[in-house]
Amino acid sequence: MKAIGYKTPSPISAADSFVDIELPKPEPKGRDILVEVKAISVNPVDYKVRGSTPPADSAEWKVLGWDVAGIVAAVGPDVTGFKVGEEVWYAGSITRSGANAEFHLVDERIVGKKPSKIGWADAAA
């Protein structure tokens, strides 16, 4: 899947601040849902993490983006609150990979169903 990531903390003005990358498509386990990302927003946490936090493993990419709206693409075996095709919105966990990608894994317990009257960009904001 396509994603945007970085390997070294640096100012946003650096040439390699954000790099287009390819990552394996994640697979949901447990209570995770796989969301096809339709919109993300940038908040101060993204900016602060980008400037100060390296990836946990220097060989891996760090992906930001935790404010998300999208469509449930798959569910883990223990998921009870969501099904494939539902529209969702959430602020993901900073302890996990971010949503600046085509797909994002998130624990169902921090996800809400997106109101149908709200568009993708507004839902992610």
Model-derived segments and their meaning:
Residues 20, 25, 69-71, 103-105, ...:
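Conserved hydrophobic/aromatic beta-strand scaffold that supports enzyme active sites
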Residues 11-15, 79-80:
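Short, solvent-exposed loop/turn segments that connect beta-strands within catalytic domains
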